[in-house]
């Protein structure tokens, strides 16, 4: 199975440049620390979108199974793990106001998806 998980978020006002510098400095570390079954694809700035409340930045992760989400959750809880450290550090830029745009999407590759037409 192949999945892409997308986390959309908004950066606090006045923190976009610091956020970009942090991403540049930590991109390779995020890639290296990806939990088992997951591959960090990067953090992307939204150039244009029809979604108005989905966040202006997207973290994209490739997952090899549904179970990879459990492994990622466990890695995020490990106080000594590099993944947990980086994720916690990155939240300094996240606008946590409940009205701030955000999103969370799980995409499954069509090749692996169960798809059928309804009987008419």
Name every feature range the model reports, one short phrase each.
Residues 1, 116-118:
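Intrinsic disorder/low-complexity detector
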Residues 44-46:
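Alpha-helical scaffolding within the catalytic cores
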Residues 17-19, 69-71, 114:
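Short acidic, gly/pro-rich beta-turn/loop elements at beta-sheet edges
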């Amino acid at each position: 199975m192949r999945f892409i998980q997308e986390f959309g978020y908004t950066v606090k006002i006045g923190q976009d440049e610091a956020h970009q510098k942090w991403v540049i400095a930590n991109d390779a570390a995020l890639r290296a620390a990806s939990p088992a079954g997951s591959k960090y694809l990067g953090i992307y700035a939204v150039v244009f979108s029809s979604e108005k409340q989905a966040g202006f930045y997207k973290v994209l992760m490739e997952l090899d199974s549904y179970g990879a989400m459990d492994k990622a959750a466990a890695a995020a809880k490990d106080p000594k793990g590099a993944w947990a450290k980086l994720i916690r550090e990155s939240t300094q830029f996240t606008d946590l106001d409940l009205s701030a745009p955000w999103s969370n999407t799980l995409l499954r590759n069509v090749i692996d998806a169960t798809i059928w037409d309804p009987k008419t």
